[in-house]
Amino acid sequence: MLTIGCHLSISDGYEAMGKTALSIGVNTFAFFTRNPRGGSVRQLDLDDVAALRSLMAEHSFGPLVAHAPYTYNPCSAKERAREFALEAMGEDLRRMEALPGNYYNFHPGAHVGQGVERGIELIADTLCQVMFEGQRTCVLLETMAGKGTEVGSRFEELAAIIDAVCARRPELDECLGVCLDTCHVSDAGYDIVHDLDGVLDEFDRVVGASRLRAVHINDSKNPCGAHKDRHEVIGAGCLGSAELGGGEDVFARIVSHPHLRDLPFILETPNELAGYAREIELLRGLQTD
């Protein structure tokens, strides 16, 4: 069965997220580690976390995909912003140890005029500091749309970050991966509508297929190469709409592709719970053997 879910609110706690997930028939989900705009985080309730872990085991959940707030910019030109990212990411990863075996996804950041190479250097340096030997959480760099000075819209940039971390901290190799966002990769110029195989072959050649650990499955309001990053409901955008994109076959190929089909899929579309349930039913019906 397709491992699929959506973003859920952590406001009522961990077990509540699990129960909400079950109510809409999903077997994974994503959540922000703290307010998506950043800030403080409430004390971890270990009993609540244990209740979620029990629920996940009982109902055969796949890995969860925790998401770092958007405010983190580990390659900012401002030292204070980099320090904030360093402190908060470190705290997030320590807290994630209460939920072992799951994923921590983050946006690599924007170099804001320093240049891509400097951005890569700063991101790798942050990861080398916040990650630790023996950690039980895999850190995922998200593929980006290339808006402004974002780092990570090209596969080569993601590979360079991972290579830089592993060169300094080889013991972290197994704890680094990539989350492929279907809206972002299309907006970045990778034509997954007409050449999904070619795009994934390129990823395999540049980064390595084994680094793919999760998928943010979203339609896009904009055509390939727009560098906009505006998500759309599945089937209503430039990927899955018959009028604007390639129709449902595009998402059928995505959820059925041998490099992707067994990964956790997370919806980040502009929807509510009932809408997510409909999208999930659609995508499960599109997966073929």
Predicted feature locations:
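Acidic (Asp/Glu)-rich catalytic clusters
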Residues: 19-25, 45-65, 90-100, 128-135, ...
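Conserved, mostly hydrophobic/aromatic
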Residues: 21, 67, 96, 104, ...
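Acidic/histidine-rich catalytic cores of soluble enzymes
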Residues: 128-234
